[in-house]
Structures are given as C-alpha cells and as structure tokens.
A protein has these predicted regions:
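Conserved, structured core segments of small domains
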Residues: 1-115
Length: 115
C-alpha cells in the first residue's frame, strides 16, 4: 500500500544524505505523520502547511518496504504514523506538490506500483 507524506523540498533534499529520513517534527512527535488517501493528504496539507511558502514534495511510501513500525493512531485508520526513521528505499516516488491559484495544495497524483 502507498501512503503519503508532505515535506518542504529543500528540507527533504538535505535529508537525502542521512541514513534515514526524519522530518522536523519528529523530535517532538516521535513519529512521521502520513495519510492513507491522496485527498486526505491535500486536506491535511492545507490545514497545517498552506501558509508555508516555497516548494513542497509529496513522498510516496510503500508500506511493505518500511523498516520502522507503522501504527494507526486513529479509529478510522486514515493516518498511519511511522515510529522511527524512514528508510529511503521505502520512498518509491517523489512528486512536486502542486497548488491551485489560491495557494491550496492539490492531492498527489495516483501512482501505480507493480510488484
């Protein structure tokens, strides 16, 4: 299954050299925030990151490849959390997050994963 994570492009590019990816809020939250659905990713992005300027990227994460524990902390199971660093080989695609003329994030494009 593919899950989604949004990150400022510049910050992600700085993380590539590290053994695992850790977003800025990880030190405080203890996990990496993700969403299960593309439309939900856009909703969350607009709720929390709309005011952030600069380019952002969507990370497409294959849950079968993630080495850290993944846990759903909500009853609806829409928000998977990765409890640990994200190994880079679990990121199967990176796409520039697009915005509409009003600055709202658009959902990430669907991605077909073949085994």
């Amino acid at each position: 299954m593919i899950i989604y994570h949004l990150v400022p492009k510049r910050f992600y590019e700085q993380q590539i050299k590290n053994a695992v990816y850790l977003p800025k809020p990880f030190a405080h939250d203890g996990f990496i925030h993700c969403t299960k659905r593309a439309d939900e990713m856009a909703r969350v992005a607009n709720q929390f990151y709309k005011q952030e300027r600069g380019p952002h990227v969507y990370l497409y994460i294959d849950t079968r490849r993630v080495k850290a524990k993944i846990q759903y902390d909500d009853a609806a199971r829409q928000y998977p959390h990765i409890y640990g660093g994200l190994n880079h080989d679990a990121i199967v695609a990176i796409r520039l997050a697009q915005r509409d003329p009003y600055g709202d994030f658009l959902p990430p494009e669907k991605l077909e994963i073949r085994d």
